[in-house]
């Protein structure tokens, strides 16, 4: 597959719509435009034209816009045809383009190939390219703002600034190693220790902000677990603000998981209602209970719901023993509205009424706390787990470099190597040092046409 052949795809989402776009990118598309429209197109001007089949039949009418390289999304020539958003119409326009450009090497685009070309042509760095997909996938206003902040280069600029400072420090180390006859006390002359301290402080700040960005992008997988009829489905409905799950007084109503995404202060939470945990001879219910335990195993957070009107029994004890120790568990006591006296719960628990709305605001705030969300923090950009991992790797190498800095100039070669590794970790975020396998994995997750 040639990276330089022209490519074409429908750029708008599948389905019917008012407007649909066919996008083409590649070298020297002026010739293709001449073939399609019988006339040249002025760059960066919208031309209202008929889109014709090879036999002259008018397929549609719309706007044709030609962007001449390098002033385009991909950095190549780009031709966009904007017509009506019917799937059949767009397929015919795309087919006509591929037919007209066949001898020019025009082919259908792969998923994410337009953005990959933008990256390869240095129109975007890798973090910005990922932000394109995140902006498309954003499910809340906060996530969309965070993705736009990343796309504008805010995150990349912070990473590049740290990277440049590490390079400068490493350059001084290498110079000292290359000219040992000068007998320079590097660590003292160039204030390596305070420079490292400042670098470490700024990197730690960036890591904290990246954690917020990961939470905003990926959210939390929250599983509602407990015995039958403790109010799991009622709580799901209350948090969602809609009747998502069926609620009846019959034990075992929920047989399979019900997943609903909600947003609290812009943070996405994937709430999973599950089958009630109990001993049963019902084959179908048993399958649902096994699936419940699988969901519990993969949860980021478990809400263990209990009915305050019923005393704890052996089943509650069994559930507590089997809950995974590595996963945070919040004990939630439901149906407090049915009590005559005030409920005295456990220290680290919440008392609520899913149906009456009591305690739900406190529960929402506790969910954000357990997610690690800091509402008072600086408005974050979106980040991915790979970004956070790379930042943490860089921090580890700076920590080792700091240990060497406490010694003397005899370990400057080790000091320089740790700086090199820290720099390498940071450049992996923006794509200056990234394997082809990782690039393929990132861009394959994009939609076709982007």
Curated annotation (Swiss-Prot):
Residue ranges of domain TrmE-type G in the record: 219-372
GO biological process: tRNA methylation; tRNA wobble uridine modification
Binding-site list for K(+): 229, 248, 250, 253
Protein residues bound to Mg(2+): 233, 254
UniProtKB keywords: Cytoplasm, GTP-binding, Hydrolase, Magnesium, Metal-binding, Nucleotide-binding, Potassium, tRNA processing
Bound cofactor: record note: Binds 1 potassium ion per subunit.
GO CC terms, sorted: cytosol
Subcellular location: Cytoplasm
EC number(s) from the headed UniProt entry: 3.6.-.-
Principal place of residence: cytoplasm
Keyword Hydrolase carried by entry: yes
PROSITE patterns: G_TRME (PS51709)
UniProt binding sites for GTP: 229-234, 248-254, 273-276, 353-355
List of residues binding (6S)-5-formyl-5,6,7,8-tetrahydrofolate: 23, 80, 123, 450
Cofactor: K(+)
Claim: ATP-binding is one of the keywords in the record: no
Pfam families named in the record: MMR_HSR1 (PF01926), MnmE_helical (PF12631), TrmE_N (PF10396)
A GO MF term: metal ion binding
Subunit text: Homodimer. Heterotetramer of two MnmE and two MnmG subunits.
Function: Exhibits a very high intrinsic GTPase hydrolysis rate. Involved in the addition of a carboxymethylaminomethyl (cmnm) group at the wobble position (U34) of certain tRNAs, forming tRNA-cmnm(5)s(2)U34.
Protein family membership: Belongs to the TRAFAC class TrmE-Era-EngA-EngB-Septin-like GTPase superfamily. TrmE GTPase family.
Protein name per Swiss-Prot or TrEMBL: tRNA modification GTPase MnmE
Lineage: Bacteria, Pseudomonadati, Pseudomonadota, Betaproteobacteria, Burkholderiales
Gene this protein is translated from: mnmE
């Amino acid at each position: 597959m040639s990276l330089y052949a022209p490519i074409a795809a429908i750029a708008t989402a599948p389905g019917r719509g008012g407007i649909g776009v066919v996008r083409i990118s590649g070298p020297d598309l002026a010739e293709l435009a001449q073939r399609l429209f019988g006339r040249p197109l002025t760059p960066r001007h919208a031309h209202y034209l008929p889109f014709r089949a090879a036999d002259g039949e008018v397929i549609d009418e719309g706007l044709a816009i030609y962007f001449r390289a390098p002033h385009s999304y991909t950095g190549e020539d780009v031709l966009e045809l904007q017509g009506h958003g019917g799937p059949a119409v767009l397929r015919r326009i795309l087919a006509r383009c591929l037919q007209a450009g066949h001898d020019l090497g025009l082919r259908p685009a792969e998923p994410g190939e337009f953005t990959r070309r933008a990256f390869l042509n240095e129109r975007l760095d890798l973090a910005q390219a990922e932000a394109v997909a995140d902006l498309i996938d954003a499910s809340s206003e906060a996530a969309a703002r965070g993705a736009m902040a990343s796309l504008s280069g805010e995150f990349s600029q912070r990473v590049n600034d740290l990277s440049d400072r590490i390079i400068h420090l490493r350059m001084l180390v290498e110079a000292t190693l290359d000219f040992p006859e000068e007998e320079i006390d590097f660590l003292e002359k160039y204030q390596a220790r305070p420079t490292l301290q400042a670098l470490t402080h700024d990197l730690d700040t960036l890591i904290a902000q990246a954690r917020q960005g990961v939470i905003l992008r990926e959210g939390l997988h929250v599983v509602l677990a407990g015995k039958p009829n403790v109010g799991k489905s009622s709580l799901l409905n209350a948090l969602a603000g809609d009747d998502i799950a069926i609620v009846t007084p019959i034990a075992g109503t929920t047989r399979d998981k019900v997943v609903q995404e909600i947003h609290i202060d812009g943070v996405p939470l994937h709430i999973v209602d599950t089958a009630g945990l109990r001993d049963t001879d019902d084959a179908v219910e048993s399958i649902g209970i096994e699936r419940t335990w699988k969901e519990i195993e993969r949860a980021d957070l478990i809400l263990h719901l209990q009915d305050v009107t019923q005393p704890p029994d052996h089943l509650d004890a069994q559930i507590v023993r089997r809950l995974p120790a590595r996963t945070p568990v919040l004990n939630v006591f439901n149906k407090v509205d049915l009590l005559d006296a005030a409920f005295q719960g456990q220290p680290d628990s919440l008392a609520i009424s899913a149906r009456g709305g009591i305690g739900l605001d406190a529960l929402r705030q506790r969910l954000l706390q357990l997610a690690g969300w800091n509402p008072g923090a600086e408005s974050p950009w979106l980040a991915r787990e790979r970004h956070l991992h790379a930042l943490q790797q860089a921090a580890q190498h700076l920590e080792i470099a700091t240990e060497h800095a406490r010694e003397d100039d005899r370990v400057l070669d080790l000091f320089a190597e740790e700086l090199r590794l820290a720099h390498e970790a940071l450049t992996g975020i923006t794509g200056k040092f990234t394997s082809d396998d990782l690039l393929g994995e990132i861009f394959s997750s994009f939609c076709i046409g982007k």
